[in-house]
Amino acid sequence: MTLEEQILKATDPALTTENWQFILDVCDEISADPERNIPAAMRIFKQRLAQKDANIVLRLLTLLVAAGENCGSRMQQEIASLAFLKDSLLARLGDRKVHKELKFRIAEVIEQLDKSFKKDPSLKAVADAYAKVRLKYPQYLKLPPSKPAKTEMTVQDRKN
């Protein structure tokens, strides 16, 4: 099976959840020949991210994080490129046609990549992208749940 077929299988719109076996197969294929497969994978990633089907994009975002964390520094460099971050991820946050839940997931992925790539200063573009998300699109960053307010028990509550 070719790399493209594996990526299409891992991001199939019929999948309702991530299939980690398919995702790991893609990561293994990319790692088998990074010089040839990373540029090909990034080309396909860009095409899949531009799809209108939210299911495809959601599966691809998970695959993108997995590839960034498992396919080595060359893949990280490609993901951290300004062109990819700006054109494929940040542009979707400003697009009114993109569903709100998808925007939450894109912001979450940028945050996750920022945490994963923090140790490498050459990947600073991801930190810059995350800073831009925090500044321009804070509504898409999930805040921790607020603590419920404490209320004093009434006499009636104590009787029950």
Residue ranges and their predicted role:
Residues 1-160:
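Eukaryote-specific intrinsically disordered, low-complexity regulatory regions enriched
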